[in-house]
Amino acid sequence: QRMQKQQSEVEEKRRMEELEQAREFQMSLILQDPPSFKGFEFALHMKTSTEVGGDYYDFFPQDDGALYVVCGDATGHGLNAGMMVSITKAGLFGSDFNDPGSTTTRLNQTIKAINLGTTRMSLNMAKFSNGSFDFTSAGMPPAYLYKSDKKTVDEILIPGLPLGSMKNATFDLEKFDLSSIILFFSVGIIL
């Protein structure tokens, strides 16, 4: 019985070390500080509820001066959610960023082809350029746009399935004037 207890303790220590390694790997995928980008100011906060979570955000500056911003949340927690974040980031780094709708459609096809079972990725994606932004959503909560000239807050809710749900899903694209502040969020991220 004493031997079993020691084996259990060794196994638990190994599992905790693996979880810590997975957490460190995931955090290395996430920018710790917002980027500097002319004409924009960013603030962000992320707090995962477990060692490895599914929260994800990223920024992709383009050669033409546009900026893509993504905010996402994989279903569940733990290693599968962390793997989905890794796959999403890799898929985005391989993207051509034509527009948020087509980029999200292509990313969905990649995620569906990898097939992580029931794990999905909800994602908002925006392209900021020339005082406006194009926006699409794949199953995320709404974003909020504060219009400084009217002092109003508009909810931006675009229906869409989470990434990996259906191979041939497409994602609607809407265009907005960027007047002041936009808020993206998931359970663990405020951007």
Give the predicted meaning of each segment:
Residues 1-3:
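Juxtamembrane or sensor-core-proximal signal-transducing alpha helices
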Residues 181-183, 187-191:
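Cationic, amphipathic, low-complexity alpha-helical segments enriched
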Residues 6-183:
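… and, occasionally, acidic/histidine-rich disordered N-termini of signaling adaptors
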